[in-house]
């Protein structure tokens, strides 16, 4: 992990296309701006973790639904023969 010190109105570059600018420093918060290409997704970490958890839940539901559909198809095709 790289640790840097920056003052208000200073920035860091990540590669050539991402810039993190320190806008304001308060006692208990730092306001930052991130300039990045539109195809780069940027999330607050708590939002990102929520998205990951929701995706996992969705996969479990899909797995359950696929099992139900498979069971229905098996039942249908057994009765066809």
Swiss-Prot record:
<dbReference type="GO" id="GO:0006109">
    <property type="term" value="P:regulation of carbohydrate metabolic process"/>
</dbReference>
<protein>
    <recommendedName>
        <fullName>Translational regulator CsrA</fullName>
    </recommendedName>
</protein>
<dbReference type="GO" id="GO:1902208">
    <property type="term" value="P:regulation of bacterial-type flagellum assembly"/>
</dbReference>
<dbReference type="InterPro" id="IPR036107">
    <property type="entry name" value="CsrA_sf"/>
</dbReference>
<keyword id="KW-0678">Repressor</keyword>
<dbReference type="GO" id="GO:0006402">
    <property type="term" value="P:mRNA catabolic process"/>
</dbReference>
<comment type="function">
    <text>A translational regulator that binds mRNA to regulate translation initiation and/or mRNA stability. Usually binds in the 5'-UTR at or near the Shine-Dalgarno sequence preventing ribosome-binding, thus repressing translation. Its main target seems to be the major flagellin gene, while its function is anatagonized by FliW.</text>
</comment>
<comment type="subunit">
    <text>Homodimer; the beta-strands of each monomer intercalate to form a hydrophobic core, while the alpha-helices form wings that extend away from the core.</text>
</comment>
<keyword id="KW-0694">RNA-binding</keyword>
<dbReference type="GO" id="GO:0048027">
    <property type="term" value="F:mRNA 5'-UTR binding"/>
</dbReference>
<keyword id="KW-0963">Cytoplasm</keyword>
<dbReference type="GO" id="GO:0044781">
    <property type="term" value="P:bacterial-type flagellum organization"/>
</dbReference>
<keyword id="KW-1005">Bacterial flagellum biogenesis</keyword>
<dbReference type="Pfam" id="PF02599">
    <property type="entry name" value="CsrA"/>
</dbReference>
<comment type="similarity">
    <text>Belongs to the CsrA/RsmA family.</text>
</comment>
<dbReference type="GO" id="GO:0045947">
    <property type="term" value="P:negative regulation of translational initiation"/>
</dbReference>
<dbReference type="GO" id="GO:0005829">
    <property type="term" value="C:cytosol"/>
</dbReference>
<keyword id="KW-0810">Translation regulation</keyword>
<dbReference type="InterPro" id="IPR003751">
    <property type="entry name" value="CsrA"/>
</dbReference>
